[in-house]
Amino acid sequence: MAKAGTVAASRLRLTRRAMLRAIGGIAITGIARPAVALQRDISFTLPWIPEGPNLITFVAKANGYWSKAGLNVDIAKGSGSVGAAQAIGNGQFQFGLSAATAGLQQAALGLPIVQISCCSYDAFMGMITMGDTGVIEPKDLEGKKFATTTKSGEFPFIPAFAQKAGLDLSKVEILQVDPNVRQRLLIEKQVSAISGFAPSIVPGYIVNGFSPRIIRFSKFGLPLYGNALFTQQALLEREAELCGAIAYGLNEAMKFVLLQPEESLAIFFKANPEMELAKGAHELNKLALDFFRYSSIHEGAKKHGIGYAPPDDYNVMTDLVMKYVAPDGKRPDFDGTVSNKFAGAVHLTDTDWSNVKLSLSNVTKLLT
């Protein structure tokens, strides 16, 4: 039989543990809750359907990078980056991914949105052609047909690309078509090139036996970044610790995806079993993921840590958005629209970065 003093000490220790757990709950949620109810529900939107460029969210959730901070993140499908940015900015979702340019556009139009982690340094906007079209450089498109979609995110930047690349668009027959028609026209050789986001188009061509080539806008001095993590300015000001937990968890997931792509794919398919049913599903999603991994290699991330947003590139990107996308908007200030507060905690070694780059020959061979 235990002594009374022993029982009292045991009860005291339990009480202290419970108290510490409660204090942890206050740190994350601002509200003291019982230990069994520490998980806080968080709403999160993707910019599109589950795919390679947003696979990191499923890794962050499955690997517990968010739940260890007491966060239960519900991931919703999106219908486009602009729609995702709008939904985040107006508070429909607390967090989400969207193309960096879409976030800047909405900020210019007055939406109170702020970026808290840079995930991709290249959206792979560009011209997509086939190996037998004779189009190797942009100027080769002169005298040929080119298909594009007006509602696609790269469309507004085609004039800037043409100017930088020395392409005279007046000498190109431009067809404005539906996205599905656009991709078919290239296969049927009715056009010599199309515009679009390579990670969403090229893997499907590869799986079906075609030989696409990509001419990236970024190759010609247009830093048009891919997915970034966004929230509302008010939430960042009010709950910086919560925003940091979401950003840190996503940055940890980026590191995992960069170093362990096959394990990341397995997590993705487990979370989205319907994505494994398509023809060539593994090859298709692996290539889409590798586009993302390729786009995550940047001197800013190497020097300052995963999630870092380089101010100079963002200023150029903002100039492009103001000129071609939101000319009637108010130019957003970098410090008020982009935060590097949560970058710097997650790093790869120089050897890791080199090995990641060596593993991406499947992407490199597609670039002109």
Description of each model-found segment:
Residues 101, 181-183, 190-280:
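Pocket-lining segment of extracytoplasmic ligand-binding domains
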Residues 32-34:
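N-terminal signal peptide c-region/cleavage motif recognized by signal peptidases
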Residues 239-327:
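Secondary-structure end/capping motifs
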Residues 1-14, 18, 22-29:
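N-terminal secretory signal peptides
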Residues 37-199, 215-216, 222-223, 368:
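Short, glycine-/small- and polar/acidic-enriched structural segments
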Residues 314-368:
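Conserved C-terminal helix/tail region of periplasmic/extracytoplasmic solute-binding proteins
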Residues 74, 82, 176, 219-220, ...:
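Short linear loop/turn motifs
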